């Protein structure tokens, strides 16, 4: 069973360090992590970079990092602005959206 990690409402460059430490700690202690992004109201590219790095590290370590639910509209807009949706690989599409891109 995956350990659920509630992502804080604000995850920006100014506030990402405590969440990064928590995520690293959870990945060290658990084989499967599920991120709950429902509370996120303010995020920037540092959040996306952290999640991508954690996902790669989890894969490298034979662990699983996934999202509890597909990203909501605000995070979809952030992914778009940051260029993550341009020619998105299917594995990334599955990770962020659990399948099809939103329209």
Model-derived segments and their meaning:
Residues 1-43, 52-103:
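STAS-like cytosolic regulatory interaction modules
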């Amino acid at each position: 069973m995956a350990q659920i990690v509630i992502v804080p409402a604000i995850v920006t460059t100014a506030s990402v360090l405590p969440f990064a430490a928590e995520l690293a700690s959870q990945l060290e202690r658990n084989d499967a992590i599920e991120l709950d992004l429902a509370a996120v109201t303010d995020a920037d590219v540092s959040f996306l970079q952290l999640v991508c790095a954690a996902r790669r590290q989890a894969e490298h370590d034979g662990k699983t990092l996934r999202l509890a639910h597909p990203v909501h509209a605000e995070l979809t807009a952030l992914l778009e602005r940051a260029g993550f949706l341009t020619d998105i690989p299917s594995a990334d599409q599955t990770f962020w959206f659990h399948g099809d891109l939103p329209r």
